[in-house]
Each structure stands twice: as structure tokens, then as C-alpha cells.
Amino acid sequence: MATIRNQRFSLLKQPISSILNQHLIDYPTPSNLSYWWGFGSLAGICLVIQIVTGVFLAMHYTPHVDLAFNSVEHIMRDVEGGWLLRYMHANGASMFFIVVYLHTFRGLYYASYSSPREFVWCLGVVIFLLMIVTAFIGYVLPWGQMSFWGATVITSLASAIPVVGDTIVTWLWGGFSVDNATLNRFFSLYHLLPFILVGASLLHLAALHQYGSSNPLGVHSEMDKISFYPYFYVKDLVGWVAFAIFFSIWIFYAPNVLGHPDNYIPANPMSTPPHIVPEWYFLPIYAILRSIPDKAGGVAAIALVFICLLALPFFKDMYVRSSSFRPIYQGIFWLLLADCLLLGWIGCQPVEAPFVTIGQISSIVFFLFFAITPILGRVGRGIPNSYTDETDHT
């Protein structure tokens, strides 16, 4: 028995297995982590689901403007289990964004972006941006009405970039309009970007493990930690089961609710839909874009969203991190969450009064959050940065 045990531990000391053991088994984790810290592993599961289903769908998809729509219908009707693959992939994108949005708002609530985890947060923002680009490209591939016109509207935004804008649009289109060359470009990129996402996710994980996970109290301690396995594997397993049930409800009972009915109409360049709406997870950003009448101003506002997110960790460090001890910031946080939900609703409304005005006010409120956060970070003092720090700062 002792020999078997020694062999087991010697296997964990091998080059590759020792890395896995260090980061997935013996990784020191704060003992007070709540279920809100389980969305990182769920995001990894979503990414794996998207890659696996995407590879199998690509085996039956034809990237040609005359055949793309029919090839998707062929997958749904003729390929055994094709309907399940497509619904898993389409709804999996929505689940991925739900998980990442919750993961991000948890980071905002508990100030997980603060020192020394600035690089972790910045990598997370890059991952979010890559997800948006990948999801947009994937939405174009079925070549329905909303796919075609969404591609036309969104890619044309690049023309607002000074000097090189028109060149970028022509390169994206592969011609003078969205056509077969565009679809082929997007199909190629759609199978490259997920693997870039995997690389960015591994960097995100490595950066996290450099300083360790934060915790609900927002304080640091090297003593109050336990190994990730088996304690948090079991805790994450509860989240995985709940996620599987939630995901299954959408796949089997409401597979098309999160999509748009116009995308079941083949793309027609001669017929513009009455209202061009992106997928629901783009709606808050889309609302900010539409709230500014000028195209260049709208693109600048979108760029400012990501600049604010990237700059957030570099604001002056705060005395108290967790919102549990910052009632003023807590109120501002819930206002931001409500504002993002309102922006999501505005994004799917027609561009007319009063929706434009509401969108402009909501956009201002969104950016005010990032302007106020550095000020609130200096308000309040009474919790040490570490359990072992002196609590008397006088």
C-alpha cells in the first residue's frame, strides 16, 4: 500500500502533472470563497462546449453565400443530432456571456481588479473583447437576414476610424460590399479566435495564480487557505449541475427565444429589415453606440467603454475593497447594474423618442460610475489589507 501511495505522489511530481497539481489540486485557496467565485470554471466549461460543438458544425457547414443558409438547415434537418449541436452552440454563446457578465460584476462588486491583480483584470477585459468579436462573426455565418445586415452595419463602423477606416472596411468585406469573400474571411477567423481565447484564458489563470484569488472580505491572508481539491471541486460541482439544468432548459424548451426570427429568412441584400437588432448580449454596448448620432462619436464611446474597464485597476488603491464594507459604493454598483439592464432594453428599441433620450442618459450614468469609483475608493478606512496587518493606522 505504501508503494502504491509513493508511486502516486511521484506521478504528481512529473513535469506536466506537477503543473496541473500545482494549479488545479494543491492550489492554495481562501477558505471563505462563496459560490460567486465559481463562474470562472463555468466560463471554461462554456468555452470547451463552444469549441467542440463548433468543430462538429463546421464539418457540415458550407461557407458560400448561396449555400450557407441551406447548409445550416441541412444540419438541422438531415444530420443526426445536428439540431442538438446547433442549439447547444447557439444557446451556449448566450450562456457563455451570462457567465462572463456575472463573473465581471462579481469582480466589480468585490473590487477584484485592485492591486496586485491588475493584470488579471486587464486580461479579462481582453478576453471579453475577443468574445464579442468571435460571437459577432459566428452570428454572421448562418447568413440569414439579421446576419447579413448586422454584418453590414457593424463592419461599416470601421469607416469612422481616421485615415485607415475605409481601407479596413474594404479588407473586411473583401470587396465593395458584404459578400462571399466576407463570409469566407469570417469563417476562417471563427475557427482561429476560439484558440486565441484559450491562450488568453490560460494567461488569465496564470496571472490569477501568481497572487492567488481574492475573497469576499477583500483582505489578504496566507494562513487562512485550503487546497482547491477536494473542497472547491465539490463546491464548483454544485454550480456545474445547476448550470447544466439551466442550459438544458434553454436547449430543449426554448431554443430560439434568445435568437431573432428574421435570421430564419435567407439573406437578401435588396430587402432591409425594419429594425436591425444584434444578439441580446451586445445590446448594452449597442445602445451606447446608438445614443450618439455621429458615427465617429459612437465608435469613440465604445472604445471608451473598454478604456474605462482597462483603466479601472490603475485608479488609486482603496482602503476598503469589498462592497460589503462600502455602503456608498454598494449603492453605486447596484445603480450601474440597473443601468446596464436599462441599456440592454434600449438597445432593442427603435431609434426614436423617447428611447434615444433614455439611452443618452443611461450612457452618461454608465460612464459616471467609472468617474466616481476612484473618489469612492478613498472614502472609508477601518479594515487592514491583511489579517496580519496592524489595524491601528494612527
Swiss-Prot record:
It holds the Pfam family Cytochrome_B. GO terms for cellular component: mitochondrial inner membrane; respiratory chain complex III. It comes from Oenothera berteroana (Bertero's evening primrose). Component of the ubiquinol-cytochrome c reductase complex (complex III or cytochrome b-c1 complex) that is part of the mitochondrial respiratory chain. The b-c1 complex mediates electron transfer from ubiquinol to cytochrome c. Contributes to the generation of a proton gradient across the mitochondrial membrane that is then used for ATP synthesis. CDD domains: cytochrome_b_C, Cytochrome_b_N. Belongs to the cytochrome b family. It comes from the Eukaryota. Heme b b562 binds at H89, H191. GO terms for biological process: mitochondrial electron transport, ubiquinol to cytochrome c. Binds 2 heme b groups non-covalently. Heme b b566 binds at H103, H204. Gene3D superfamilies: Cytochrome Bc1 Complex, Chain C (1.20.810.10). Keywords: Electron transport, Heme, Iron, Membrane, Metal-binding, Mitochondrion, Mitochondrion inner membrane, Respiratory chain, Transmembrane, Transmembrane helix, Transport, Ubiquinone. This is Cytochrome b. The main subunits of complex b-c1 are: cytochrome b, cytochrome c1 and the Rieske protein. It is found in: Mitochondrion inner membrane. A ubiquinone binds at H209. InterPro entries: Cyt_b/b6_C, Cyt_b/b6_C_sf, Cyt_b/b6_N, Cytb/b6-like_sf, Cytochrome_b, Cytochrome_b_C_euk/bac, Cytochrome_b_N_euk/bac, Di-haem_cyt_TM. Disulfide bonds: none annotated. PROSITE patterns: CYTB_CTER, CYTB_NTER. Its cofactor is heme b. Heme 1 (or BL or b562) is low-potential and absorbs at about 562 nm, and heme 2 (or BH or b566) is high-potential and absorbs at about 566 nm. The lineage of its organism: Eukaryota, Viridiplantae, Streptophyta, Embryophyta, Tracheophyta. The chain crosses the membrane at residues 39-59, 83-105, 120-140, 186-206, 232-252, 296-316, 328-348, 355-374.
